[in-house]
A protein has these predicted regions:
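Extended, Lys/Arg-enriched charged tracts that mediate electrostatic binding to polyanionic substrates
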Residues: 171, 176-237
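Basic, alpha-helical terminal appendages of large translation-related enzymes
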Residues: 403-430
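Mixed-charge, Lys/Arg-rich low-complexity intrinsically disordered regions
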Residues: 294-322
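Short alpha-helical "patches" and their helix-cap loops
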Residues: 231-244, 249, 356-360, 394-399, ...
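A recognition module on extended beta-rich or small alphabeta surfaces enriched in W/G with H and D/E
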Residues: 230-300
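Short secondary-structure junctions and interdomain/linker hinges
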Residues: 86, 90, 157, 161-165, ...
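The feature captures two recurrent sequence modes
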Residues: 1-191, 314-409
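Short, hydrophobic/amphipathic alpha-helical patches that form generic packing surfaces
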Residues: 80-85, 152, 156, 212-226, ...
Length: 430
């Protein structure tokens, strides 16, 4: 479905307030490995194939309009230029930033994008903010002006809402859990301890604060919202748009679809470590904007304060036991990265059919060095299938993938990857 995206009036030239600047970092694009790009490509092929029929109608046009493609991790500077046509900018940030800062960025029409990339082990979902979620999840629907109006309004409210020490402790617990889960070498005991700490912080929440109300409304809409018909809704929430596995659950009886209601939303807590048991279906984005104004009146918080880029709301200091530079490093062997890069180079073309088959044969011999790596086998198999070479080796790789389907989650990942090999629908976002 082709939509005509509406461009914003005038360029985005307002300066970023000084108190938000420390959260902005340079995207370390050269640090992304061929494995990182392969993870991006796997997830995006799945996303586009599924959301073609299940996401908000602007999704595919929104991907293109926001400067996002399938084959490689996007450059945030490219996204920034693309989004400026729709009244937005994009900046790179270092993982979790304080909730008030996260909200104020968006209230000012600035999409903060974490630069981290999820690992192969967490390809289906990661609790840590990463570039898949924050670019391919958040950016596409921002090309809809009515959604933009809603996001800026709720985030302006969130930037001014009062938080409690319990809210701040919960933020730190969520951040710690995401770091532990994405850090190679974390022990089950460390993960368990972080999960227990999160549960303790959740249990310590007494009365629902202003910030918690807005956070819940944001979660059930911007992150996990559905729109349209209750029996056949469309997805617009970033958490769903960046996770096909959870999106597929939406259309089963495992997830209750509930008509959107402001009071129900702000009184319904959420758990970032589990699938959502229910989701809210709004009639339109205008309905959501109206709800934000109702909540703002109820909390006696004026809207419109952040339109002047020189005004600001104080941001609480970031308190953490880890430094901003102490981010997880994925310990991929150099030879494995080189093998992924060789496959990436072949996909780019520029070699003869004879040379391509010779390289695929050489890479096939290397697969045995990585007996547990299912993604590189899918990458190899896709190329061999596309160019109709080495049929016996293809059969052996398929058998190896079958043997690697040792858990329900792994089985689903491999099956989803195999389903797209030799098919065209996910090849582009057009």
């Amino acid at each position: 479905m082709s939509l005509r995206l509406k461009k914003a009036e005038g360029p985005m030239t307002e300066p970023i307030p000084a108190h938000l600047s420390p959260f902005i970092v340079e995207q370390p694009y050269g640090s992304y490995t061929a494995i990182d790009h392969a993870v991006w490509r796997y997830v995006m092929r799945q996303n586009v194939a599924f959301h073609r029929d299940h996401a908000h109608a602007i999704y595919l046009e929104g991907l293109k309009g926001s400067g996002i493609g399938i084959e490689e991790i996007p450059r945030i500077e490219t996204m920034n230029e693309a989004l400026s046509r729709f009244g937005w900018r994009a900046v790179a940030v270092d993982g979790f930033i304080p909730p008030a800062a996260f909200m104020e960025f968006q209230a000012r029409g600035i999409l903060p994008i974490a630069c981290d990339m999820r690992s192969v082990e967490h390809v289906a979902y990661t609790p840590a903010p990463d570039i898949i979620h924050e670019s391919a999840g958040h950016a596409p629907i921002l090309c809809d002006p009515s959604f933009t109006a809603f996001v800026k309004t709720i985030c302006e409210l969130g930037a001014q809402a009062l938080s409690t020490p319990e809210d701040d402790a919960l933020y730190e617990a969520i951040r710690l859990l995401s770091i532990v889960k994405e850090t190679p070498g974390s022990t089950p005991e460390e993960v368990y301890a972080a999960e227990e700490r999160l549960k303790e912080c959740q249990a310590a929440i007494g009365s629902v604060s202003e910030a918690n109300m807005v956070s819940r409304l944001y979660w059930w809409t911007v992150e996990y919202g559905l729109i349209g018909d209750l029996d056949n809704p469309r997805i617009y929430g970033a958490g769903l748009l960046s996770s096909v596995g959870e999106s597929q659950r939406v259309f089963t009886d495992a997830v209750a679809k509930v008509p959107f209601d402001l009071d129900t939303c702000i009184m319904t807590s959420y758990d970032i470590t589990s699938y959502q048991p229910q989701l809210f279906v709004c009639e339109s984005f205008e309905q959501l904007t109206d709800a934000v104004h109702v909540l703002a009146d109820r909390l006696d918080i004026p809207l419109g304060r952040l339109k002047n880029a020189t005004e600001s709301v104080p941001i609480p200091p970031r308190v953490s036991s880890r430094s901003a530079q102490d981010t997880p490093e994925k310990a991929y062997p150099a030879e494995l990265i080189a093998a992924y890069q060789a496959l990436r180079d072949l996909r780019a073309g520029g070699v003869s059919s004879t040379e391509r088959e010779a390289r695929l044969a050489s890479l096939y011999e290397e697969l045995g060095r990585y007996p547990e790596d299912w993604l590189i086998r899918l990458e190899w198999l896709e190329l061999a299938t596309q160019h109709q070479v080495m049929p016996e080796a293809q059969a052996e790789v398929r058998e190896a993938l079958s043997r690697l389907s040792t858990t329900p989650d792994r089985r689903e990942l491999i099956a989803n990857g195999l389903a797209l090999i030799g098919t065209a629908p996910a090849a582009s976002v057009s």
